């Protein structure tokens, strides 16, 4: 065992469990690629100010949870706590919004970092797949992204997730609601930190998970009663599009999410099998974020789905993904000459696109066959001096147990045919 361990609140992904994480990432990314979203990758760290402006200076993410560092040149950087601000920054820097048709549709995958209290389903290092549609204000786009996430979850076999939906209004109607909410909240019995939040961003108080606070919020003014006609019509169109597509959702008037940049449509994916940390993903519209970080007006919408949380949801439902074996053929040489010959065969198979592995280290037949079994290979190649003298190798079907000689010159063609 090493003297060192993974830092508190983080984890290592190792086989075989890592294969499930890769499969989840692929399942989420596949419908995005099929819908015109291009892949984007951003640095693991950014200027601190990007998140302070974009995510919100009063959010827990910025005030308590960011990992920050100072470079030798004095620059203040932060490990990325979320993906949207970085993706929008990169799109603006590359002038993608000027290069072609809008919206600019992007997807990404990576690790993110927040200094949180480690607990089941919540880590200081976590993996997400995200999607952003930049530069267009259209309820069809909001609905598209929600439907694609629903499609991804269902392709994995998940059934016990729910979609929560709300509208946060826009810069025209939200200030009126903000004032009404502040008036209501100031009369409640709240701690000093929460009272400071009332003055900076009162909507965040609605996201408070403490039971004593939630009890006091029962009679809070409803945002829906303050939405302007344009926001009401926009939200109803999103709801209608989801209903027409057969995607079930629940209206949640207190859903505000944890980031300050959201406007109008906001949504969250929750799974009832995950306890208190039930969110597996979420997102919404962020029409003003581009201007917050110094860009032009670019109404946009996006989401991020947690890979870690999705794997936990699969486990909660008892779902085991049908993962392909990483090895189709396993070669077992008996003797030095066989090692050279079979290694050449394995190399030829790999070049032909067959997943092949080799019994390294000169192990005996018994130990090598145990390794072949553990590899999950469908076929095993075995060769000794007598086989080589006859110009053959023994080909064993690991499922049926049948074994027979195959000419060395025909091994690659025979296996390619059998494996389809």
Swiss-Prot record:
GO terms for molecular function: ATP binding; histidine-tRNA ligase activity. The gene is hisS. It comes from the Bacteria. GO terms for biological process: histidyl-tRNA aminoacylation. The keyword Cell cycle does not apply. It catalyses: tRNA(His) + L-histidine + ATP = L-histidyl-tRNA(His) + AMP + diphosphate + H(+). SUPFAM superfamilies: Class II aaRS ABD-related, Class II aaRS and biotin synthetases. Keywords: Aminoacyl-tRNA synthetase, ATP-binding, Cytoplasm, Ligase, Nucleotide-binding, Protein biosynthesis. This is Histidine--tRNA ligase. Its main location: cytoplasm. Belongs to the class-II aminoacyl-tRNA synthetase family. GO terms for cellular component: cytoplasm. It holds the Pfam family tRNA-synt_His. It is found in: Cytoplasm. Its EC number is 6.1.1.21. Homodimer.
């Amino acid at each position: 065992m090493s003297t060192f361990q993974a830092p508190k609140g983080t984890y290592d992904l190792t086989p075989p469990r890592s294969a499930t994480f890769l499969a989840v990432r692929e399942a989420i990314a596949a419908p995005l690629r099929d819908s015109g979203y291009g892949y984007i990758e951003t640095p693991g760290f950014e200027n601190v100010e990007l998140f302070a402006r974009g995510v919100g200076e009063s959010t827990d993410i910025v005030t308590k949870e960011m990992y920050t560092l100072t470079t030798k040149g004095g620059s203040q950087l932060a490990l990325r706590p979320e993906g949207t601000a970085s993706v929008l920054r990169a799109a603006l820097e590359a002038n993608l919004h000027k290069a072609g048709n809008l919206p600019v549709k992007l997807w990404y995958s990576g690790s993110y970092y927040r200094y949180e209290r480690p607990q089941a389903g919540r880590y200081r290092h976590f993996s997400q797949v995200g999607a952003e549609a930049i530069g267009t204000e259209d309820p069809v786009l909001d609905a598209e992204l929600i439907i694609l996430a629903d499609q991804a979850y269902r392709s994995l076999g998940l059934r016990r997730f729910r979609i929560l939906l709300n509208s946060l209004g826009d810069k025209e109607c939200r200030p009126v609601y903000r004032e009404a909410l502040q008036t209501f909240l100031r009369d409640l019995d709240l701690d000093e930190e929460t009272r400071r939040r009332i003055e900076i961003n009162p909507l965040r108080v609605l996201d408070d998970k403490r039971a004593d606070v939630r009890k006091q919020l029962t009679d809070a003014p409803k945002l829906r009663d303050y939405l302007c006609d344009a926001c009401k019509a926009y939200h109803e169109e999103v709801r209608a599009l989801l209903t027409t597509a057969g995607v079930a959702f629940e209206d949640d008037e207190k859903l505000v999410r944890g980031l300050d940049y959201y406007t109008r449509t906001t949504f969250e994916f929750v799974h009832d099998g995950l306890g208190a940390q039930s969110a597996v993903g979420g997102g919404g519209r962020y029409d003003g974020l581009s201007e917050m970080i110094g860009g032009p007006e670019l109404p946009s919408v996006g989401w991020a789905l947690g890979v870690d949380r999705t794997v936990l949801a699969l486990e909660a439902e008892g779902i085991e993904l049908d993962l392909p074996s990483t090895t189709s053929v396993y070669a077992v040489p008996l003797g030095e000459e066989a090692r050279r010959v079979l290694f050449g065969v394995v190399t030829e198979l790999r070049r032909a696109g067959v997943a092949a592995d080799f019994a390294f280290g000169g192990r005996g037949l018994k130990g090598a066959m145990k390794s072949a079994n553990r590899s999950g290979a469908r076929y095993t190649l075995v060769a000794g001096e007598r086989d080589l003298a006859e110009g053959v190798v023994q080909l064993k079907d690991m499922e049926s147990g049948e074994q027979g000689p195959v000419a060395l010159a025909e091994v690659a063609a025979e296996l390619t045919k059998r494996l389809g």
